[in-house]
């Protein structure tokens, strides 16, 4: 079943899409360091990230300094929610670079 999933790679690339499995978001040579699910909160201009990838586990944000986000998502804040309700403000904690 196609679901809204995201991954992050060791090179700092953030990729999301409607896929069956998180590994479907990988490109050749990517090393995934976690993923999860997402939804858009248009009221607060946020992309809400949560849960974890069955394939790759929870995102390992601590391994990154820069997150490369598709430019189409410019203007959205990225926020990850852990299972215990703790919030990690990705947009505040990491340097965000946009790519086309």
Q: Positions of the model-derived regions?
A:
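Eukaryotic phosphoinositide-binding membrane-targeting regions
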Residues: 1-100
């Amino acid at each position: 079943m196609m679901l809204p999933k995201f991954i992050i790679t060791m090179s700092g690339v953030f990729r999301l899409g409607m896929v069956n499995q998180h590994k479907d978001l990988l490109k050749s040579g990517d090393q995934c360091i976690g993923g999860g699910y997402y939804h858009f909160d248009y009221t607060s201009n946020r992309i809400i990230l949560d849960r974890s990838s069955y394939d790759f586990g929870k995102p390992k944000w601590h391994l990154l300094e820069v997150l490369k986000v598709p430019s189409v998502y410019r203007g959205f804040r990225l926020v990850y929610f852990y299972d215990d309700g703790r919030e990690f403000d990705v947009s505040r904690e990491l340097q965000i670079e946009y790519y086309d």
